[in-house]
Every structure is written in structure tokens, then in C-alpha cells.
Swiss-Prot record:
NCBIfam families, per the entry: PRK13259.1
Alphabetical UniProt keywords: Cell cycle, Cell division, Septation
Protein name in the entry: Putative septation protein SpoVG
Protein family: Belongs to the SpoVG family.
Originating species: Macrococcus caseolyticus (strain JCSC5402)
Function summary: Could be involved in septation.
Biological process, per Gene Ontology: division septum assembly; sporulation resulting in formation of a cellular spore
Region described as Disordered: 88-115
Ranges of biased composition (kind: Polar residues): 91-100
Amino acid sequence: MKVTDVRMRKLVTDSRMKALASITLDEAFVIHDLRVIDGNNGLFVAMPSKRTSDGEFRDIAHPINSEMRQEIQEAVMKVYDETEAVEPGTIATSEVSSQLEESDSDKTLSEDLKA
């Protein structure tokens, strides 16, 4: 399973949440409401979650292995970094090449960003 598209909306906020993202897997399945969070150890991608009746948060969707989690993290953060100049509140997209180059474990994103 590969991340084939990332859509991101940067937020204008003083909170730790910096952006919301949606990812497409294998051009067939979309997961909405991933969050880019500014944590104690830097930026990271949080999976969509909901609050349970006891006040805890539980992931709605999440990868079950570290390789998929890393691929999602890299794809989302790549778009976040590439859209540094995009006005907050604007939706930015970047399609991930369907022929991902696996050299040195680097995932490459296509160069066309749409605002």
C-alpha cells in the first residue's frame, strides 16, 4: 500500500496543530483529518481520532506497522515543507508519484503543487 496523494490545509493558529491533511492510499482509499502537530520533539503527524466517553482519544484509522507509519509521516511532512510559502488556510496538494523511487528509502513527491 502506497500514499498516492496528500492534500493539506495549513492553519492560522497559535495552537500546536499546524495543519490538517488528507491522504489517498493506492489511488483508492482516502483518510481525512490527519493533523500536523508541533510536539515537544518537533513536528509529527497524528492520525484522526475521536474522544471516548471517558475523555481519552482513540485513533479512528492508523497504520499497523512502522513502515506504513513512516511512509505516511514522510509523505505528509514533505508536502508540509514544500508548501512553506503557501498562505495559511489555502489547500495545497501534491500527488505522490505512482512509481515511488525506493533508492535509499527516500519517497519522492511530484513537483506540481496546486494551491
